[in-house]
From Swiss-Prot:
Keyword field contains Transferase: yes
UniProt family annotation: In the N-terminal section; belongs to the N-acetylglucosamine-1-phosphate uridyltransferase family. In the C-terminal section; belongs to the transferase hexapeptide repeat family.
Binding, Mg(2+): 105, 227
Gene (UniProt): glmU
Protein name per Swiss-Prot or TrEMBL: Bifunctional protein GlmU
Keyword Acyltransferase: yes
Catalytic reactions on record: alpha-D-glucosamine 1-phosphate + acetyl-CoA = N-acetyl-alpha-D-glucosamine 1-phosphate + CoA + H(+); N-acetyl-alpha-D-glucosamine 1-phosphate + UTP + H(+) = UDP-N-acetyl-alpha-D-glucosamine + diphosphate
Active-site residue list: 363
Length: 448
């Protein structure tokens, strides 16, 4: 089929009341992005003539945020069912074209399954995506007579006998625009929901002796709909299983795929090992020969080659260069850059700071708004005091500086390269030349 005659309608106007949540259903996240976005991405990958999203007022902000000249957004005036939604726009389409109907709450459909439908559509007026399920739950049932599809009955309108049918309707179908224009205005709302069902066109097509084909999805999991939080969790599990499988097949060792979560995109090299309970969010890049230990959370960050991220570290909007060691229990916040061969250890927090090559902060420190040179030692308990109550202030530390334990650096401050700062020192002024810096303190002994 020529996709230049393919028009896609995405139905996204349902109220989502079964979610029991004060958040639009299709804006809940699946794999780190809104449910609806998955369906839009699928539609765009098919390169159709047009894409139209029929939405309700809950999605106005999402529409504005995702404004795209290739997508038309139509607000459903009254929420009276899928048939009513399509009747609002059907006359916008030319005759003798094809219309693919997707659902905003069925986000796991693969491109391969849709392409199978497109091929089958050449020999029919309507092609449905159906599946046989051992536990059909609340799906509409496919009614056949002598193997021929004659009707779709929705779950709430089905008899007990019909509910025993295992073949179900995914909702996804391809139909000719010419016939849809005719049938869409013949359907009625005489059902338990008092809604106009798009599925009623099947019985109308059968009466007019039109051929109705069906196609099975690549996997039954693809047709998982999302109407409540339980189904969302189920869909997330399916999605993460798919992502873990793809990564394993591409050479990433994931030790516990059932406890790995990719909530965005990952670009990666070779020889990567990811342990139990790791979460990757947003856009993440990982180089070659990287080890990520249990419980790490990595968001919108880049990790270079030959790095080890030790257990329970949190890394966000950070660039880590090559041969670095991070963690365990390290928090790297936005604006952090670790140059080659750096080592950041236990209970160290870094924010808006560049740590130069071969520098190390191995224990219990806070470094904020800092530029730190090469081969600098940050002793345990070092704190950059970078906030004066009104604004953040900068700390600059030159190369080869040694900072002893339990040191406070009062920003703004500039410390010359080669300086040695003794343990327990509070540094309040710039150090303009290599120096030994300490605060005089008396050690007092009193007899008990």
């Amino acid at each position: 089929m020529n996709n230049h005659t393919l028009n896609i309608i995405i139905l996204a106007a349902g109220k989502g009341t079964r979610m029991q949540f004060d958040h639009p259903k299709l804006l809940h996240l699946l794999g780190g992005k809104p449910i609806l976005e998955h369906v839009i991405n699928l539609a765009q990958s098919l390169c159709p003539k047009t894409i139209t999203v029929i939405y309700n007022k809950q999605y106005k902000k999402f529409k504005i945020k995702n404004k795209n000249n290739s997508i038309t957004w139509i607000k459903q005036k009254k929420i009276l069912g899928t048939g009513n939604a399509i009747s609002q726009i059907i006359n916008n389409y030319k005759d003798h074209e094809n219309i693919l109907i997707l659902y905003g709450d069925v986000p796991l459909i693969s491109k391969n399954s849709i392409q199978k439908m497109l091929l089958k559509k050449k020999n029919s007026t309507i092609t449905l995506l159906t599946a046989k399920l051992n536990n059909p739950e609340e799906y509409g049932r496919i009614i056949r007579k002598n193997k021929k599809i004659v009707k779709i009955i929705e779950y709430k309108d089905a008899t007990d006998e019909q509910l025993n049918i295992k073949e179900v309707n995914s909702g996804i179908l391809i139909v000719s625009s010419t016939n849809l224009k005719k049938w869409i205005f013949q359907i009625h709302a005489k059902n338990n929901q008092n809604e106009y069902y798009i599925t009623d066109i099947i019985s109308l097509a059968n009466k007019d002796n039109h051929k109705i084909n069906s196609v099975r999805p690549e996997k039954n999991d693809e047709i998982q709909g999302i109407n409540n939080l339980l189904q969302l969790v189920r869909a997330e599990k399916i999605y993460q299983k798919q992502q873990a499988k793809l990564l394993l097949l591409s050479g990433i060792m994931i030790y516990n795929p059932s406890n790995f979560s990719l909530r965005g995109t990952l670009k990666h090299g070779k020889n990567i090992k990811i342990d139990h309970g790791v979460i990757l969010e947003g856009s993440v890049k990982i180089g070659n020969s990287v080890i990520i230990e249990p419980g790490c959370i990595i968001k919108n960050s880049t990790i270079g080659n030959n790095c080890t991220i030790k257990a329970y570290s949190i890394i966000e909007k950070t660039i880590i260069s090559n041969k670095c060691i991070v963690g365990p229990f390290t928090h790297l916040q936005h604006g952090t850059v670790l140059k080659n061969n750096t080592h950041v250890g236990n209970f160290v927090e870094i924010k808006k700071t560049t740590l130069g090559s071969y520098s190390k902060a191995k224990h219990l420190s806070y470094l904020g708004n800092s530029q730190i040179g090469q081969k600098v030692n940050i002793g345990a308990g070092t704190v950059t005091c970078n906030y004066n109550g009104k604004k953040k202030l900068d700390t600059i530390i030159g190369d080869n500086v040694f900072i002893g334990s339990s040191t406070q650096l009062i920003a703004p401050i500039n410390i010359k390269k080669g300086t040695i700062i003794a343990a327990g020192t509070t540094v309040m002024k710039n150090i303009h030349e290599p120096s030994l810096v300490y605060n005089e303190k008396k050690q007092i002994h009193k007899k008990l």
